């Protein structure tokens, strides 16, 4: 959410607890649309568990939103840079929901943004960049 949380979403899911592909050199220039990034994320057990729970929730809640008079539901997935985890989650969830009879549309808000180490927090560091780390000591 380094570029801000979605202001139009009905539901927002924070995926920053999952491993960040940004810190894998081969994956950094790729996005969540790439099979390599999706394979990396799928290897993490929490990935499937998380998406399974979100899918179950959405399959239950979306019809309830419709029954309340909403014609659509906006679901946002967030991570730090908006290029890997959130993109992969949106794509996979759209596939799952389509398989369940829904008609999802996917829009990636931050996909075109360049990767930046200054907004990513490396595992084990107290701050986002070495420079910040030095300033905070």
Language model features with spans:
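Catalytic cysteine-centered active loop of the rhodanese-like fold, especially the PTP/DSP P-loop
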Residues: 71-94
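A structural preference for short, hydrophobic beta-strand core positions in alpha/beta folds
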Residues: 106-108
